Each structure stands twice: as structure tokens, then as C-alpha cells.
Amino acid sequence: MSASVAVVSGFLRIPSIQKSQNPSFLFSRPKKSLVRPISASSSELPENVRNFWKWLRDQGVVSGKSVAEPAVVPEGLGLVARRDIGRNEVVLEIPKRLWINPETVTASKIGPLCGGLKPWVSVALFLIREKYEEESSWRVYLDMLPQSTDSTVFWSEEELAELKGTQLLSTTLGVKEYVENEFLKLEQEILLPNKDLFSSRITLDDFIWAFGILKSRAFSRLRGQNLVLIPLADLINHNPAIKTEDYAYEIKGAGLFSRDLLFSLKSPVYVKAGEQVYIQYDLNKSNAELALDYGFVESNPKRNSYTLTIEIPESDPFFGDKLDIAESNKMGETGYFDIVDGQTLPAGMLQYLRLVALGGPDAFLLESIFNNTIWGHLELPVSRTNEELICRVVRDACKSALSGFDTTIEEDEKLLDKGKLEPRLEMALKIRIGEKRVLQQIDQIFKDRELELDILEYYQERRLKDLGLVGEQGDIIFWETK
């Protein structure tokens, strides 16, 4: 699902994003604007949105007392307060019968075919089938869904070319390849043998559309629900000014004597009547992940990150010993480390680098006698040779990655400052700038470390001090027998 570039010593790779890609909230492209929202009560609202609001009213989900309603906003569609909304006040509640999740698929006509499918694949297939069914009970909701988002999975080849050199590009291509492989499997196992159940020929483009919808709009991390579309709730947009994602939504019982479940969405902040209601999608996602999942990026430098992949080569003569040590410290054959703009190196990264680089005279630390202490020893420099190697490998990896870009940070910033850019080009520029800044930061960290190699204290010196064999000036103490 990802591509990587091997560099230098063979134990460090510059990969695509390796974090889990769980579907979470929904698509939006936040922009600050003073444009007046067009609300659901207005005749200016698109007909499909008015029909959607009426459908929700007919379902008993909304009424004249509802505190928020759909509206045309700078991001596209959003939820706007009909009256003042207090902090942590419930904005909407959607009953389970209006959710779309794997259970919905199981109860549908195609349910018997989907038992062996991945949950997201089965829901994607359900969405596509219902989209082509004119009499679908979900018709009004499906008519509300966009044909695409600004997620990089929908970008053209020309647009993707603007991401040349970035990890986001390799991740996007890897994700698209993964989705295509899942579609080909689905086509052979389900679609072709069961043409009678599908009124229209389902294509790869349909499948990518459904994937993008789920990636951008589905809620996850809920009680018993890891993949669920919630009509109306999925109009809520993201605001970077909101710094908490706690308690914005939950699944709860409908009442004391009811077995029904409700999806409850709360406003994390006070909202005035007529203003848009926002939440925080995910505080931990990088800009590359935001671009892939939702189709937007933030200006916050803490969203800029780069993933270094470090692996123990199978050709290493000490492969087994190193793997045992890594696994005993909750790591593995490959380590993924996210370096964030302006922040220190992640915990465990230097230790893992030193472990992977261990060899020659330093290999004695791999002996079983050190099993319980080696990770602690690796917190500090082992030897000049070991430390010099990891500095060289990381710096060469950064230079290799930077050479993959056609432009400098200054050139990208000049383009960005001109303004009036297409949203996707603007996003690509910000991603390029962010990744290059972090690469330069990593390179500088290890460049500074190279300058300290002569003054660092290494394992042997620390050991001699522990034994009382080194004086205050660093000279070795000898005793002569009398």
C-alpha cells in the first residue's frame, strides 16, 4: 500500500505515510469567510439539500425546534446554528435506523454476498448499488453526496505531478493501487457472478468514489462502530481553531425504556445563531493525512511531518539478535518515526538507529548478558563509529529525498505568495514546503550531532567511569602492584 526509496546503508528508507488510515470524519476545506450562509429554510438552497432536509423531517429526526440546519457555506455545505448553541450542547441526534454501516449491508439484498468482504468494501459496494437504484430508500441522502472531494485520490495526473518528491504522492499512488486491487477482487468474486443483483455495471471510478466518500465522511472510534455514515452529521466541518476532539460525538441509548441507539453530536464551543457549527476532526493527523483523507491542509506547522522508516536488514549477520531486542522493546523489524516540524526527534528513534547500526567491535552489546540492559545503553551514544554511521545514513537519506523535488522552498513560497491559486495547487505547494522544511530540520539535527562526535561520551568511557577507572580529566587510572 506504499512505496519507499532505499538509501545508503540499506537500513533506512524514506517511505510513504505508514500510519493507520482509519476512516474518520468528513470532507471539508476550511476557509475563513464572511460570506452569509444560505440555510435550509431558504429557497436559495439547492433542491437536493431542501429535499434532504424534508426527508429528515419526515423521518422525525429534525423539526422546527432543531438547533442547526444544513447551509451553503464557504466549504461547500455545512451546519449552521438556528439559535445560540452552548458549549457541549447537543446539536443533533440521529437514530440507528438512518445509519449506513456493515450491519446495514448485511440486512440488504446483497448482504449474503458480503460476508467475506472487508467492512469498508461491503459498505462501498452498498453505496454504489444504492446510487444506481432509482427507487433506493437512501436516494435523497445519496443525492447529497459529492461526486468527488479535493482528496488526493481524486486528483488528475497533472495535479498529482505537483506533488513530485513528496511522501504524499507515493502514499496516494499506493492507496489508489490498493483500492484498484480490491476492486478487481470484488469484480471477480461478486460483481461478475451476480450481475442480476446490480442494475448497472460498476466501474473502478465508482469504487474510488465510494472509497473517497467513506474516507472523508465516515465516523469511527465509536462504541461498537468503526465505520458508519451518519446523514446530516456528516455535514459538520472542521475548524483548526478548535483544539479538542473530546466529547464532540458519541453513541448513546435513545431512552430509559428504549433499545434504540442514537448518534449524538455536540458543539465543542459556544456558537452564535447564524454561525457555522464546527468540530475538530483529528488533532494528530499530519497535513499529508488531512489532504489524503479530506482534501485540505492547515497552516499550522505542527501538521507538517515526515516519516522515516528504519529497518533491520535480513542480510545483517546479527538480524535475529537485533530483532529479539527490538521486539522486547515493543518494536519490530521495521520502525516508523514521524518527525514533526519544530519538534524534537520521536522517542526511541535514536535507540533504534543505534541498534540497527551495531556491528564490529560494538557487537558485544548484543550478547545475552546485556539482554535486560541494552535498550538503556542505547539511549546514549555507543561508539564514535556507530554514531557517525547513523548521522551519515540519516543525512544522506534527507539529501536523497530533497533531491526528488524540482523546486526549492523559496520558489514554492514565491508561488504561494502570488495568491489566486487553484485549491489543489495551493495544497500541493503547502505539502511540498512542509515536507522540505522537516527534511531540512532532520538534516540539521544530525549535522549538529556530527560536529559533537569528538566531545560525546561513549559506552566504553561511561563503563570505565562506572568502574572508577577514569579520572576527573578523563585520563585512565592505572594501579601498579607493589
From Swiss-Prot:
One GO cellular component this record assigns the protein to is: chloroplast stroma
> Does Transit peptide appear among the keywords?
yes
Q: Which residues are involved in binding S-adenosyl-L-methionine?
A: 75-77, 217, 237-238
Output the Gene Ontology terms for molecular function.
[ribulose-bisphosphate carboxylase]-lysine N-methyltransferase activity; protein-lysine N-methyltransferase activity
Transit pept. (range)? 1-57
**Root EC class:** transferase
Keyword list, A-Z: Chloroplast, Methyltransferase, Plastid, S-adenosyl-L-methionine, Transferase, Transit peptide
Question: What is one process in the GO biological process aspect for this record?
Answer: peptidyl-lysine trimethylation
Protein name per its UniProtKB record: [Fructose-bisphosphate aldolase]-lysine N-methyltransferase, chloroplastic
What is the gene called? LSMT-L
